[in-house]
Amino acid sequence: TSVCSYLAQMLSMVALPFFLQRTFGYNDVSTGLLLTAWPAVIMVAAPVAGVLVGRIHAGALGGTGLAAMAAGLAALAWLPDAPATWDIVWRLALGGVGFALFQSPNNSILIASAPPERSGSASGMLATARLTGQTVGAAAMALLFHVVPDNAPRTALLAAGAAALAGSAVSFMRLSLPLPDALVRRKNA
């Protein structure tokens, strides 16, 4: 699920500047300011998701988050011809909130699943999954510019949404698995 989420995020973050500038005519500064909506909502939503993981199963939070991210990315891909600033911002915010709802619970469940003496290895797995997703996402964007040069950014956003949706499905599958003891204690506290 981490690979899917980070692939989706990197693919979309590489595609969006091209999309906003080439398709809608935004300049560099406006594009940069618009894109801050994604990390800004992550800063607010990630700590909330961290608290919620003590109350709601991490699989449900992660699955819901990645589904929201997929919806935000699909909505970005199908922006109207002359979008208002708000049209772009709410879609970016939806993607960012979705990513935050996934990231904190996913990290919590992975670290809590490892025995204490293996927490360093679990953390390393998270980093490896993150970098794998980011690398594949960036490479996929380069490939799309080669294969569909006229429509690469929109295609990338749709592909990113599909990756997030795949991650969502896998995350929801965790609902059938027992929670790690550390999360059960936290939930019952």
Specify the residue positions occupied by each region the protein language model found:
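12-transmembrane solute porter fold
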Residues: 1-182
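Short, highly charged, low-complexity non-transmembrane loops/tails of multi-pass membrane proteins
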Residues: 183-189
